[in-house]
From Swiss-Prot:
EC number: 2.7.4.3
This protein's UniProt keywords: ATP-binding, Cytoplasm, Kinase, Metal-binding, Nucleotide biosynthesis, Nucleotide-binding, Transferase, Zinc
UniProt function note: Catalyzes the reversible transfer of the terminal phosphate group between ATP and AMP. Plays an important role in cellular energy homeostasis and in adenine nucleotide metabolism.
Protein localization: Cytoplasm
HAMAP family: Adenylate_kinase_Adk
Pathway: Purine metabolism; AMP biosynthesis via salvage pathway; AMP from ADP: step 1/1
Binding-site positions, AMP: T31, R36, E57, L58, V59, G85, F86, P87, R88, Q92, R160, R171
Amino acids binding ATP: G10, A11, G12, K13, G14, T15, R127, T136, Y137, Q199
Region (NMP): 30-59
Top-level enzyme category: transferase
Entry binding sites for Zn(2+): C130, C133, C150, C153
UniProt protein name: Adenylate kinase
Extent of the signal sequence: none
Length: 213
């Protein structure tokens, strides 16, 4: 079972990917983790990726696909995997398909966790982080006992730059421009499945399990 997770930043696709991985005993693979592991282990591909990252440049698609295909060869991927954070663009999706088809494989499901922009802006701009211990809260869904003060250590809470409404809007516009076309791409291949991400987390997961069987 080869699964790709799609959805805007803040849609909750990472959380769902972890839940899928646990239920179906397949690895949750994120490109960030692959980069970190290869750089830490000083692999040839990791060294190549690091030269781009050190310059603040994007790692080329071909290299990312090489890193991912390398990860797929590991024993824990024998029954499939959940890929999170890749592909983000049509060229990346095409490169991944080409690499998979060379092994006689293809993507089984592309699951799109759908959440309207306004919900995502509310979700993310309501997040708060503790300056002391790093604990995270949400003013609506997971508030602290005393407003603006961490339950765990008593330090004050802040709104991180990443979660400010303007930053979230910018990230969403990049998503719509670059990643949204993937929805049509995978729909054309007959593997797209959409779930309503505005539901409670467990209901979203139940909908995904219904799709995967």
């Amino acid at each position: 079972m080869k699964i790709i997770m799609l959805g805007a930043p803040g849609a909750g696709k990472g959380t769902q990917a972890k839940k899928i991985a646990a239920k179906y005993a397949i690895p949750h693979i994120s490109t960030g983790d692959i980069f970190r592991a290869n750089i830490k282990n000083n692999t040839e591909l990791g060294q190549k990726a690091k030269t781009y990252m050190d310059k603040g440049e994007l790692v080329p698609d071909e290299l990312v696909v090489d890193l991912i295909m390398d990860r797929f060869k590991e024993a824990d991927c024998a029954n499939g995997y959940v890929l999170d954070g890749f592909p983000r663009t049509i060229p990346q999706a095409e490169a991944l398909d080409k690499a998979l088809s060379a092994n006689g494989e293809s993507v089984d499901y592309a699951i799109n966790v759908e959440v309207p922009d306004e919900n995502i802006i509310n979700r993310m701009s309501g997040r708060r982080a503790c300056v002391g211990c790093g604990a995270t809260y949400h003013i609506q869904f997971n508030p602290t006992k005393v407003e603006g003060i961490c339950d765990a250590c008593g330090e004050k809470l802040i709104l991180r730059d990443d979660d400010k409404p303007e930053t979230v809007k910018n990230r969403l516009s990049v998503y719509h421009e670059q990643t949204q076309p993937l929805i049509e791409y995978y729909s054309g291949k007959g593997v797209l499945k959409e779930v309503d991400g505005t539901q409670p987390m467990d209901d979203v997961f139940a909908a995904i399990v219904k799709i995967l069987g």
